[in-house]
Amino acid sequence: MENVFKAYYESEPGLIEITAGETGIITLYFTKKKSNLKSDSKSFPVHLKECIRQLDEYFKGKRMTFDLPLIISGTDFQMKVWNELKKIPFGKTASYKDIALKAGNVKAVRAAGNANNKNKIAVIIPCHRVIGSDGKLSGYAGGVKRKKWLLEHERNSLINN
């Protein structure tokens, strides 16, 4: 069994909890409070330290993509959806229908939404960039307010750089 490490990152839209194994990032999500189970940062694997560094660059508007090893598993369709999410450009959005089409099944809009919802690595796999076909912000595990913040942050970063 692989060792698991936990770290926290304070961002403007809220506290982020990151878990990593010895070979990659396992989860990254917004949380309300720190758990008592936390790792000593001296023992963090290189990719967890790198994740924190890349998040810092992202929130400073200096990073548009992430280059980190991820430990993810899901159905074939979920993996296709998550791969398509990573292709949505920084500062841009796509609809659930767009994602379903690119994942290979235009009729699987609801399934694409469910796969989006099952994403355990927020921000890095940018599920916040998916919006309704009507352009409305809907559903985000971190809350619609954070989704709006992230999208505005990305757009503002593009304008300011």
Report residues per predicted region.
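Short clusters of hydrophobic/aromatic residues that line enzyme substrate/ligand-binding pockets
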Residues: 68-70, 112, 137-140
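Major-groove recognition helix of helix-turn-helix-like DNA-binding domains
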Residues: 85, 109-118
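Histidine- and aromatic-rich ligand-binding microenvironments
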Residues: 89, 120-123, 135
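…primarily DNA-binding HTH/wHTH and HhH modules…
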Residues: 133-161
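Short Lys/Arg-enriched helix C-cap and helix-to-coil transition segments
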Residues: 123-130
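Basic nucleic-acid-binding alpha-helical/helix-turn surface characteristic of O6-alkylguanine DNA
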Residues: 1-107, 153, 157-161
